[in-house]
């Protein structure tokens, strides 16, 4: 793929965390690329989170986006993060199908200060939850399939996709590009135990174990040899 400018889609499912979602949108800056935001109104239609991700990706693909960022509504960018991230991923081989930035929350007294930082800021990089903010190319779904929409309302869909990526022989890469994840601001307000158990049970049915270390009992969904890791049955 050539040099920028690229068309970049930013997919943000929003359930109940409106203030921080607005902060996230405020923080999303680009000087070198074209950015379009795709709000997924979970506050109106409570879809599984994975379905909201898929819908946002489809909208971005329809609009011709080259790269798609999927972000939790409790995350923040530095002003230069998106351009640096797109530039880095545009240089990767096709084997790197998903990339992520690194959390720099320990750098600041107040998380929102990241929006006033620049490339000379001495960030303290820390690994956080991988799928709180990720970037894929527009052809990601062709290589890895869509996110499994059976995880309802959420939980485990990220473990599922990470395992699928591994089974398919692809890789994930993290960059020293800054972002902040405030952490579980939306799911905190959900009734976790019952829903989380339900999603975990589905993961167990699908993969035969719940190790979550990229080594599960089954190598094909539901132990069905006619399926590939890209597949899931609604």
Question: What does each model-found stretch correspond to?
Answer:
Residues 142-166, 170-180:
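Donor nucleotide-sugar recognition loop
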Residues 24-35:
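Short, acidic, metal-binding catalytic loop of nucleotide-sugar glycosyltransferases
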Residues 54-67:
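Active-site nucleotide-sugar/metal-binding loop of Leloir-type enzymes
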Residues 65-76:
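Short beta-strand-to-loop acidic/aromatic patch adjacent to the donor-nucleotide binding site
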Residues 117-136:
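A recurrent flexible, glycine/aromatic-enriched loop bordering the glycosyltransferase active site
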Residues 82-97:
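Conserved donor-nucleotide/metal-binding helix-loop-beta segment in metal-dependent transferases, i.e.
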Residues 174-193, 202:
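Active-site donor/metal-binding and catalytic loop motifs
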Residues 98-112:
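Short beta-strand-to-loop element that shapes/binds the nucleotide-sugar donor at the catalytic cleft/hinge
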């Amino acid at each position: 793929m050539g040099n920028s400018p690229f068309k970049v889609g930013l997919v943000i499912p929003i359930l109940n965390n409106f203030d921080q979602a607005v902060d996230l949108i405020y923080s999303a800056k680009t000087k070198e690329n074209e950015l379009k935001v795709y709000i997924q109104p979970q506050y109106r239609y409570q879809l599984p989170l994975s379905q909201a991700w898929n819908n946002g990706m489809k909208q971005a693909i329809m609009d011709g986006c080259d790269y798609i960022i999927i972000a939790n509504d409790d995350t923040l960018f530095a002003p230069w993060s998106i351009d640096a991230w797109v530039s880095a991923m545009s240089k990767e081989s096709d084997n790197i199908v998903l990339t992520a930035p690194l959390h720099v929350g320990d750098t600041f007294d107040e998380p929102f200060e990241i929006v006033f930082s620049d490339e000379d800021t001495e960030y303290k990089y820390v690994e956080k939850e991988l799928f709180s903010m990720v970037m894929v190319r527009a052809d990601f779904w062709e290589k890895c399939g869509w996110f499994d929409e059976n995880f309802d309302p959420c939980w485990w869909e990220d473990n599922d996709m990470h395992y699928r990526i591994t089974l398919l022989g692809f890789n994930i890469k993290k960059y020293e590009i800054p972002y902040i994840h405030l952490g579980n601001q939306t799911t905190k307000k959900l009734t976790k135990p019952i829903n989380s158990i339900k999603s975990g049970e589905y993961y167990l049915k699908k993969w035969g174990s719940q190790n979550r270390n990229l080594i599960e009992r089954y190598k094909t969904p539901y132990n069905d040899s006619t399926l590939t890791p890209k597949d899931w049955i609604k």
